[in-house]
Amino acid sequence: MADSSFSPFAMAQKQFDDAADILGLDVPARELLRYPLREYSIAIPVTMDDGSVRVFRGFRVQHNDARGPCKGGIRFHPQETLDTVRALAMWMTWKCAVVDIPLGGGKGGVVCDPHNLTQREQEQICRGWVRQLARNIGPWMDVPAPDVMTSSQHMLWMLDEFETITGERQPGFITGKPVGMGGSLGRTEATGYGAVFALREALKELGIRPSDTVASFQGFGNVAQHAIHMYRQLGGTVTTVSCWDQQDEQSYSYHRKDGIDLDQLLGISDRFGGIDKSKARDLGYEVLPGEE
């Protein structure tokens, strides 16, 4: 079982405290940066396809906007917490600052499981999230994006709702849109490729050739799939990937000593990156149970 006492936000604060000590940061700056500037907890009532009404909990955390509008994704996950969203918003502040992008850190989420929701129900959650937060987000304040179990389709629903509320065209409200609606080419691959490009530069510094490395990947969604593709292009070998099994409600690792076949695994995975373990065994993968 996972350790329920673990706090991502406490870990993020500890990381900040260590860095602040090294930098000799003054006390007022520390007190400001250790906590979010603003955070919102919302309730989203949705009429389900069967006629019942469910209320979904949602969040948006704006950690810091000193360098520009807050920026960060929206996560749909059944175990989403405000604590996790706080940590991710803080990390977004540091990531934008480190690469000198004039944006601050934000993050959002909804406690829900898209596996068990119809397209219409997911659309209503997206639109409800925007309606609740429309006065506190936008191109000059806070720009959302896709994240865990959200896609360009979710962003399009949110954009449409925001434009309906404001009564004007607002393409800068959200990123990760379909290319035909103002999205960016390469957005789908960017996060996974970026992770591997960072790894490539680190290996250069260490004098290690990618072809001499072996890796395991946690997750098999959009980010991991593109990261695995690029890592293998560089010559690296991936022996193991792990992902969540929705039916068993636990994670499994899929291992093959001589390296996985990415196209093969893509052929037996669902749209969320969940791998069919029976088919994986038939293809010669060792299936190892992980955390529930």
Task: List each model region and its residues.
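A generic local secondary-structure boundary/capping motif
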Residues: 32, 43-45, 98-101, 146-147, ...
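Charged catalytic carboxylate motif
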Residues: 15, 84, 194
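Glycine/serine-rich phosphate-binding loop and adjoining beta1-alpha1 elements at the start
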Residues: 77, 97-211
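Structural signal for hydrophobic packing residues in well-ordered secondary-structure cores
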Residues: 16, 20-27, 89-96, 126-141, ...
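Glycine-rich beta-alpha junction loops
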Residues: 36-37, 46-48, 62-65, 107-110, ...
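Glycine-rich phosphate/diphosphate-binding loop of Rossmann-like nucleotide-binding domains
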Residues: 183-292
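Glycine-rich, N-terminal phosphate-binding loop and its surrounding beta-alpha-beta segment
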Residues: 42-114
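Short, Gly/Pro- and small/polar-rich lid/capping loops
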Residues: 2-43
